[in-house]
Amino acid sequence: MTVETPMKDPCYWDRELFPHTPLRALAPDLWVVQGSFPAARLPRNMVVYRSAQQALLLHSVVALAEPEMRELEALGEPAVMVIPHWDHWAHIAAFKKRYPRIDVVCPRASIDQVSKHIEVEYSCEDYFPRHGVKYHQPPGIRPLEGVLEVPVGAGKVALLMNDLITNVPHQPGFYGLVLRLTRSSGKPRVIYFVRRQLRVQRQPLRAYIAALAQRRDIEIVTTSHGECLLTDVANTLSRVAQDL
């Protein structure tokens, strides 16, 4: 595909680049890449989903070096940029500049904050039902973020989560100590900092995650921080619910 690079600022993309992993396939139409940011304490994942129309949905974008961007563009045309929470604004302006026709989508409750960085064209709550994609609003949290449900073949689905479940290993240094002391690292869980920001009500959220654990069609759960849930997903979700 042709990328429209504004001549006024040909280096705009280079300024967005920080270390990242290669694109990794999770399923035939689902990929993840992990990027790091100097101002962020935890790496962040971008999840890429390809629809039946060969259009790409980019969830929590991460700017990639040109070889990886060409690899991404070879998968399909970037058509939807999901900003899953107002705090995930890094790189969004650069992606809109690179792909002027991309749809900019975020949760309704995050629009005011995201709009400080880029114009939001659609809310998740309106956009995805119109396009045949399920968008969950988990009970017991502020609606600043939600969960996307996408098909991955053979009657199975993937859940694209944001910060709701974090799965980071123990980290070094003082911040790593804080994570360990607050039981926020080492295994998949709803961590302390997320519980505070989303004002989690434990009982309804626990019931929601426990209900997900009962489903047998959930093959993958992606996260914005740490490793995605790829094996023993039902039991892992059950443990997350019990731990909450």
Task: Enumerate the language-model features and the residues they cover.
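Short loop/helix-cap segments at secondary-structure boundaries that form the rim of catalytic
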Residues: 95-96, 111-118, 129
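Active-site environment of divalent metal-dependent phosphoester hydrolases
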Residues: 65-66, 87-91, 111-114, 166-169, ...
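Proline-aspartate-enriched helix->loop->beta-strand connector
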Residues: 78, 217-223
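Catalytic core of the metallo-beta-lactamase
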Residues: 2-63, 119-183, 204-217
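Short, polar loop motifs at secondary-structure junctions
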Residues: 87, 106-113, 122-126
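Short glycine/proline- and acidic residue-enriched helix-loop micro-motifs
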Residues: 185-199
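Active-site metal-binding motif and surrounding structural segment of the metallo-beta-lactamase
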Residues: 57, 63-106
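Binuclear metal-ion centers of metallo-dependent hydrolases, dominated by the metallo-beta-lactamase
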Residues: 225, 231-244
